[in-house]
Amino acid sequence: MELRKEMPLLARHEGQWVGVYTTVDAEGRIIDQHKSHLTCEFSNDSKFPYKQTNRYMWSDGRTEEHFFPASYANKKIWFENERISGAAWEVDSDTVFLTWKRNDIANSKLVEMIQLSSDGLRRSRTWHWFVNDALVKRTLIEETKVV
C-alpha cells in the first residue's frame, strides 16, 4: 500500500508549513494566538506511514512541540497517542476532515476542516472544540507552505 496514492490530497500537504493559530471563545473573543511551524511527512514505516510534527511559538517566549505518528486503514489516517485519538480522511479534491479527542480533556471532541489552495501553497484550517457536546471555542489557522 502506498499512502500517497491512496490519499492523494493528503500527499499534497507533505512539507513544511508556517502560520498563525488564533483561538476564539464560543462568543468569538480572541483567547489565544501563536505562530506555528508544522512538518508533514510520509515514510516507508508500515506501522506509521504518516508523521506530523507541530511546533508552536508564543510572543511571550513559550514553545511547544508535539509529534503525531499516524497509521493507515480504510482510506483514513489514524492518530492514537498520549495527546490525541482520532482520524483524518479526504472529503473531496481539496478538503481534509478530521475528528479527534484530546486525551487530556474529559468528554472532548474536536472537528477540523483543512482547505488546501489549488496551487498547494496555502491552507486554511478550522477546529471546533466541543466539551460535553457544547461548543467551547474555535481555532482558526492560516498557513503557507515553505518547503
Show which residues each predicted segment covers.
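Surface-exposed coil/turn segments at beta-strand junctions on protein surfaces, enriched
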Residues: 10-12, 91, 118
